[in-house]
Amino acid sequence: MQLFQNLLVSTTRPWALVRGQNTARLLIVALDANHNVLVNEIENDIFRLIKQLAPGDDIENANVEVTHADVRYKQKKSLYKVTSTLTGPIAIEDVIYFNPPGGIPNTVDTSKDIIFRRIRFGRTEVFAQSEALLATQVQNKKVQAKKGKLRMVESQPSDSQEASSGDMKVDHRYVRSGLTNGMISGLLLFSIHSKRTTSAGRLVKTVIIGLGAGLLPMCMRNYIPTLKIEVVESDPVVLNVAKEYFSFEEADGLKVHITDAMKFVKERAEGNNSSKIDVLIIEVDSSDSSSGLICPEAEFVEEPFLLAAKDSLSDKGLLIVKFITCYPGVRAAVYSNFEKVFSNLFCLHADKGFNELIFALKKDSPFIGEEELAQACEALQRSLEHNSGDWVKQALVDSKKIKQLRKS
């Protein structure tokens, strides 16, 4: 119900939700918490009402979708709430779905209730959240990466018996977000295209702006051990939450900097070649809804930052930006900013909505067209032919969805 309260008191969020669902009209139905009406009866009433309100006579063939805000949860438990002076309200909760989402690792017993842990940021509660799978503790199986190859590994389950909820940890093998899958796919695809290889002592230097729950860097470390990951997070409260509730751990090859992201990127841009970044990922939510952006902060898609980001990249560097907006005008303006700085631009639409990833290569030439992308997809498939994990299949599917960025 809190979600509905936040939605209804806002002057912009309902319209943003309408645009985000790519629909012309939105009907919000708020039910008393003590109601005992069956879901199918509610839907029947909604359809009868829509028939009376809808324009035209072809309502039977209209595309009407009903989304339930709370009915999908069998159980929801609040674990922790904190208000940060930098980030605002942060809430952690465990949920059990009536119908769990797909992609659950086959080592998880799906005949029992599956618990998911979520982080919610108050400033973007309607739109954004990170969600992780809780499972018995798993151990990583270390595989030596061969010279010149991007070697992937998957963690294996431990031999421990069923654990209580207190013994459960976040399973970083599980990827719920289509955007996370897309980032991994794009990183692998353009690494293959640029013929970036790794050898002893040469890791792919990766910087992620924005920690959140820490799921992206932990997932990338598990699946792509050839990355040397640095995370830039401005809020120490967010780091503490990620460690305490989402099993985030710093280790060799994964370090967090509590500092200003703009300052960090500018210093890398002005530094020598040894400090340059191979892959720069921007994954931060907007704190100002009036900008028309849900992700990222407006300054991260403005020309001054994009110029600094380009200068911070190595010769074969790649910039990945998580980009979410409900407004076509804002999208066009952001595209225009990118086109002023980069020539090789690509995008991937994820999660069947207005979520998008923008990929920008530092090198302006040679120009990469659809034919070159198709060849890179084939090369990626060959490089992963000995990996049988579900995430590999998804990476290959997503890589084929990456297209040249166009305004129209």
Model-identified regions with their sequence ranges:
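The AdoMet/dcAdoMet-binding core of the Class I SAM-like
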Residues: 3-81, 85-88, 96, 108-110, ...
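Residues in well-ordered beta-strands of folded domains
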Residues: 93, 120, 184
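Short, solvent-exposed loop/turn elements at domain surfaces
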Residues: 100-102, 126-130, 368
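Short beta-strand element of the conserved SAM-dependent methyltransferase core
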Residues: 10, 119, 358-360
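A short, structured beta-strand/loop element
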Residues: 118-134
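A residue-level signal for beta-strand positions that form part of recognition/binding surfaces
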Residues: 89, 116-118, 357
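Class I S-adenosyl-L-methionine
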Residues: 94, 325-408
